[in-house]
Amino acid sequence: MGDTRRRLAMAQWDVFSSRQLEGNSLAVFFDGRGLTDVDMQSIAREMNLSETTFILPRDAAIERERGIRVRIFTVQEELPFAGHPTLGTAFALRGESGAQQVTLELNVGKVPVHFEDNAGEPPLGEMTQIDPTFLIQHNREAVAQATGISIQEFDESVPIETVSTGVPFTVTPLKSLAVIQNLQLDAAGAAEYLAKSSSKFFYFVTRETVDRNARLHARMLFYNGEDPATGSAAGCAAAWMVAHGVAQPDERVMIEQGVEMKRPSRIFVRAAHRDNRVVNVRVGGHSVEIIRGEVFL
C-alpha cells in the first residue's frame, strides 16, 4: 500500500549569520495551503525553534500587489511580526534568483526586504519595519524589583523604554558586559510586569561589546529560553538608539546577540530622524541555508 501522507517541503536557515551553525535557526515551509491553524502550531512545536514560517502561495498578480503571504509561529503562539523569520523567509524565497526585493505580507502588514550584493561578501537582506511607537519609559526601581536585577546594574544614562515596530519590546540598558553575561532573570516576575505594562518581552542591552565593531550587546530571554537573534527587538533598539543619541540618524550599526548561547549573531540596524520623529527603521543581516527536506503529515 502506497504512502498517502502529505509531504511538506521545508528548509532550515541560520539567520543573522553568514556561517552555518550560528545565528538564529528558522524553519520555512514553502506551501502551507490546506493546513489549519492547529496544524501550523503543531508543526512549529515539532520544529522546536524560536519560530517557524508558512508560505501561502496565491495568484501572482495578488502577490505583486500585496506581497507573498507568510504566517509566523513560535512553539506557543502565532506572531503578527518577527524579524528573523521575515529575513530568513525572504532569503528562502529569493533563492538563487538574485532578486533585489522580496515583499512579504505578514499579519502586521506588508514588509519589504531589500537585498545588497557586494563583491566578495555574502548577500545582505534588509527589511523595513513599521515606523516605531515609543510607548512608556519605566521606573528603574520597579523594573529591578520585577526582574530581580540589582538597581545598581542598570545604565542610568539612557531610559528603560518600551518601543514597538509591530511587537512591543522593553529596551533595558545595563551597565556592562559582565552584568548582561551573568544575567539571572526572575522569569515569573518579569512576565507579570510585562503583562501589566503591555510589553511582549524585555530586550537587555549594554554598550560594552565583545566585538569592537558592535554598538550594542544584547540578550532576549523569553518563555522558550533565550533567543540568539531577535530582529523585531533590534528594530526597536535601533529606534531607541537614534532617539537617545546612541546612534546617529541613518548610521548603520551592528548589534551582537546570541554570544552566551554560542550562536553569535550580527544584526545590522539603522533608522532615520525627520520632523522630530524616528522613522524608516531598517534591520538587516546575512542568512545561510543549512537543511532542506520534507515533513510528512
Where do the language-model regions lie?
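Active-site proximal loop and beta-alpha junction motif in alpha/beta enzyme cores
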Residues: 1-81, 87-297
